[in-house]
Amino acid sequence: MIYEERLTLTHSKSAEEYLEYCQTDRLEQLRAAGGEPICLLSGLIGDPANQYLQITAYEDVQAWEQAQAKLLPAPADLVESETARLMRPIASRPKPVVPQADRRAVYGCRRFFINPADLSDFVDSSENGIWPRIESQGACILGLWTTVATTQPMEILLLTGYHSPTHWEETRVTSRQQEGVDQDLRQ
């Protein structure tokens, strides 16, 4: 699988209209072109509310290229700027199909910049260290990706789902909510 990360900044007064366009037209266009939308997220804390992050899965690069020929660009009167790039999964997430039970109301989007030589340690620490602890608290890892191109430093994208901003806070190591977490998972 290959994934497209699309960052769209709408005109400040067009955010709601862009979201409606995605829900009524764009997501269906993606599916008809062979893509599988994984998520469409907007800024809540940190990123502006009129910035959208969309992750779409494709069978391979050829399927992505074929889809580009079929897709129409977003309406110019809604979009101020847009970038897209290909990402590859580097861990056990994303799952081939993300079940509804794994969907969350709020997602944390984190970007890490690491030395490519440290990738296997980074993935191991994520999958066997951090993820079991926060998943035991109800969080759900949507995916861990890096760019298709090899770069120095290597950029890593992590999307983690939470039930609410309060739930996110409860999963922090410094939170008082940590008292009920299996101490073996905190090691």
Residue spans for each PLM region:
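Hydrophobic, helix-prone linear segments
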Residues: M1-E4, S14
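Short, well-ordered beta-strand segments in beta-rich or mixed alpha/beta enzyme
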Residues: Y3-L9, C39-A69, R104-F113, W145-T146, ...
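A generic short-segment signal for beta-strand/edge and adjacent turn/coil regions
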Residues: L7-T8, E20-R26, P75-E82, R111, ...
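Short acidic, gly/pro-rich beta-turn/loop elements at beta-sheet edges
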Residues: E16-Y18, W64-Q66, P94, S120-F122, ...
